[in-house]
Amino acid sequence: MASTAAAASSQGCISWALRQRGLGGGGARAVPVLPRRRFCVSAAAGAGFDNENREYVIVGGGNAAGYAARTFVEHGMADGRLCIVSKEAYPPYERPALTKGYLFPPDKKPARLPGFHTCVGSGGQRQTAEWYKENGIEVLYEDPVVAFDGKTHTLKTSSGKILKYGSLIISTGCEASRLPAKIGGNLPGVHYIRDVADADSLVSSLGKAKKIVVIGGGYIGMEVAAAACGWNLDTTIIFPEDHIMPRLFTPSLAKKYEELYQQNGVKFIKGALIDKLEAGSDGRVSSAVLEDGSVVEADTVIVGIGARPVIGPFEAVGVNTKVGGIEVDSLFRTSIPGIFAIGDVAAFPLKMYDRMTRVEHVDHARKSAHHCVEALLTSHTKPYDYLPYFYSRVFEYEGSSRKIWWQFYGDNVGETIEVGSFEPKIATFWIDSDSRLKGVFLESGSSEEFSLLPQLAKSQPVVDKAKLKSATSVEDALEIARSSLHSGSSV
């Protein structure tokens, strides 16, 4: 890598001061400002990337990067000073669409870019490539960072470009966990879904498929299987647990959703592990072989068995060995001054429950991006206080007999109380030993009912469990929970 002195000696340099923030705990306190570093942009900046300096660099082009860019623009700090380095071929987009509307059949109005660029998912402006250009934000497409030197503040991309940063935000997200190649994990017709290219490949396969197997009973598996129903395909979901969505759903709740999927023709094979995927004479996947020896025919396989944080060359920044990801404090500062991490890759303190965590969800991606940039650009030192939130919307294609939309807030710990018949509503409440409401789940709620959920989960009020158990409807149960907010027993 060329030296810093080479850039400093170039003619016509433009210098600026970069604020570097100190480290420490996540409490609301004064944050020391470190001595200013002065950087100089090479005179050849317009012609190439030989030691081209940037005041701010975001590595990663996913949801969090798009929302971070918006916050930079809101502060008037993006014009000519911000660069996004991405492995994606497109500007940041709302990734949840890839397992929902993007997979709809062509005759059922599938989602396509530029329709779901950030920040439309939160009601904001659609940030197309033109938006980034108009706001002076440089985006390097399909050119991920492959090398990092924290001492010299230097990044190297896969194409050989060299960037020097003042402040760095790591927003590399996650990658899909894969089946080993030796058991057929890379066969033609085996799909993983994480970006638009993955989704395009899957859509192409769905258009020719007859029998599909979905491996995994979590978010990806359930959303892809629901989309496959729109194509009228023979669909089987295989997973090792006793029921779908085991990290969130209770057995009772899972049973109701499983029955709905079965009504749409989906078959379940529970408590099963994949031994291998076999190829046919054409080399394409033809079946899934289970550990018990049974064989499930399939011409298309979708694997949804989780995701792993993309640390890449940034391991030296500091990895949390318990939850994975790059460890940060409540302002998203890493162990190295001037380096931050946001979104799926960030291991951060979950203030509400006093534990370190990592959240793979678009809501956290959006909020962590905003919080981090606010902390970077202002004197804001309020610790990030995230309320866990998950949701899913499936069977929303035209012609579907029943649309599904549920939301969950809080922590799914403690005793559960389920109310409702799933026609269409159902609610589940998680109550701890002190009768405090810790988490709440609602299917098919109204906008007013959904807006109540975060209030309940955040306040953690003491509820009357006997009344809640005797509620005759979801509406009645929510009103009982709402009344507990005013009892003076909230956290």
Curated annotation (Swiss-Prot):
One of its GO terms (cellular component) is cytoplasm. NAD(+) binds at G217, G218, Y219, I220, G221, M222, E223, E241, R247, G306, E360, H361, Y391. It is an enzyme of class 1 (oxidoreductase). Keywords: Chloroplast, FAD, Flavoprotein, NAD, NADP, Oxidoreductase, Plastid, Redox-active center, Transit peptide. Its cofactor is FAD. InterPro entries: FAD-oxidoreductase/Apoptosis (IPR050446), FAD/NAD-bd_sf (IPR036188), FAD/NAD-binding_dom (IPR023753), FAD/NAD-linked_Rdtase_dimer_sf (IPR016156), MDHAR3-like_C (IPR048618). L-ascorbate binds at R366, R393. FAD binds at G61, G62, N63, A64, E88, R95, K100, R194, D195, D344, V362, Y391. Its EC number is 1.6.5.4. It catalyses: 2 monodehydro-L-ascorbate radical + NADH + H(+) = 2 L-ascorbate + NAD(+). NADP(+) binds at Y219, I220, G221, M222, E223, R247, G306, E360, H361, Y391. Residues 1-42 form a transit peptide. It is found in: Plastid, Chloroplast. GO terms for biological process: response to cold. GO terms for molecular function: monodehydroascorbate reductase (NADH) activity; oxidoreductase activity, acting on NAD(P)H. Induction: Down-regulated during senescence. Gene3D superfamilies: 3.30.390.30, FAD/NAD(P)-binding domain. Catalyzes the conversion of monodehydroascorbate to ascorbate, oxidizing NADH in the process. Ascorbate is a major antioxidant against reactive oxygen species (ROS) and nitric oxide (NO). Belongs to the FAD-dependent oxidoreductase family. This is Monodehydroascorbate reductase 5, chlorplastic. It comes from Oryza sativa subsp. japonica (Rice). The gene is MDAR5.
